[in-house]
């Protein structure tokens, strides 16, 4: 826990034991930055600052959506900023603020072990660095809060900028026909869309929170102006994310259309191949029918000739005068009859 006294000349580090005296003195802005809430930090929030138990509970536990609680002497705000993790996962980095008349308490929400401990401290450290360098001289806790929240929105904007490069890369793959691994492409597509939706949600909810804060009766016109500026920053991030989501949606539609066209062409080629095979099979069947028909036509004469050609001693028909011409007549008639039948059935 860092206890700081921000004055017109800079910033001074103080001890926790000095907090009650600092809050009573009326000199400068008392800034307490709590990287993670432990028993001592919870005691400070409850006993020294005497914050509402519900606000303390929200500061100790993880908030999945931004929150705003307005009290008579302070405002509690919970916000999120994105951090890209493994395999496209987006971590929600939480920052809670108690903004009073003479103090600002910043509490960094429960941190996922997969996130480096320095990541949640970026915005508060950036503001502290600016104060130490003389580039920032906040006169009120709201002005200090404005600087910290502005750093958050810049981080969100940088997050969108990085995802924009991914969107352009996906678009180049699709339009260039360079999708060599569809599974990897779809994974990258989902991760990019997920990241844009996550940061868009954070910015939209942040805009709603700060827009509501502008209507609070307990803040001055200057404070209202700074709050409205933070709302405008969140709204700008949301609009940028919306634009990239629309662009990515166009890439998805183009890719889907490409897949449909390719699938249609493949199906058409398969149908053409099947048709060619069917035509070849039909032609072969016609040939088989013609061959079978002629074989049947010649089978009858062959059968009769074979019988008459048998070289047996006792064959009465060989001694019959009309046997030979009758055999020839039967051969001719049977052949003609078979020819007519096959012709009528279009086998010939």
What are these regions (language model features)?
Residues 1-4, 10, 20, 24, ...:
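Cytosol-facing regions at membranes
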Residues 1-60, 110, 119-127:
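N-terminal pre-transmembrane cytosolic regions of membrane proteins
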Residues 6, 25, 70, 99-100:
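Generic beta-strand structural signal
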Residues 34, 149, 156, 237, ...:
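Alpha-helical transmembrane segments
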Residues 60-77:
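Short, structured protein-protein interaction patches enriched in aromatics and acidic/basic residues
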Residues 72-187, 204, 211:
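Extended alpha-helical interaction modules
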Residues 102, 152, 173-175, 180-308:
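Membrane-associated alpha-helical segments
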Residues 289, 294-348:
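Alpha-helical transmembrane anchor segments
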């Amino acid at each position: 826990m860092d206890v700081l006294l921000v004055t017109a000349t800079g910033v001074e580090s103080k001890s926790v034991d000095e907090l009650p005296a600092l809050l009573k003195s009326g000199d400068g802005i008392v800034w307490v930055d709590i990287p993670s809430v432990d028993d001592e930090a919870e005691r400070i929030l409850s006993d020294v600052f005497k914050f509402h138990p519900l606000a303390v509970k929200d500061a100790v536990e993880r908030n999945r959506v931004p929150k705003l609680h307005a009290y008579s002497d302070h405002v509690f705000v919970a916000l999120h900023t994105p951090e890209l993790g493994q395999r496209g996962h987006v971590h929600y980095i939480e920052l809670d603020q108690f903004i009073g008349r003479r103090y600002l308490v910043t509490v960094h929400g429960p941190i996922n072990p997969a996130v480096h401990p320095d990541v949640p401290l970026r915005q508060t450290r950036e503001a502290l660095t600016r104060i130490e360098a003389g580039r920032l001289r906040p006169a009120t806790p709201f002005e200090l809060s404005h600087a910290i929240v502005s750093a958050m929105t810049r981080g969100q904007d940088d997050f969108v900028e990085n995802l924009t490069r991914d969107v352009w890369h996906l678009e180049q793959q699709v339009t260039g026909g360079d999708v060599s691994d569809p599974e990897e492409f779809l994974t990258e597509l989902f991760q990019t869309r997920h990241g844009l939706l996550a940061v868009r949600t954070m910015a939209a909810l942040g805009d709603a929170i700060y827009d509501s804060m502008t209507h609070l009766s307990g803040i001055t016109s200057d404070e209202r102006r700074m709050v409205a500026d933070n709302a405008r920053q969140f709204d700008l991030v949301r609009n940028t994310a919306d634009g990239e989501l629309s662009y990515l949606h166009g890439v998805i539609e183009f890719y889907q259309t490409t897949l449909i066209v390719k699938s249609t062409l493949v199906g058409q080629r398969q149908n053409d191949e099947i048709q060619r095979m069917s035509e070849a099979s039909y032609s072969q069947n016609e040939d088989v029918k013609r061959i079978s028909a002629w074989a049947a036509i010649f089978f009858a004469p062959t059968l009769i000739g074979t019988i008459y050609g048998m070289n047996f001693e006792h064959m009465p028909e060989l001694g019959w005068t009309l046997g030979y011409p009758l055999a020839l007549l039967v051969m001719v008639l049977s052949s003609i009859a078979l020819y007519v039948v096959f012709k009528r059935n279009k086998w010939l």
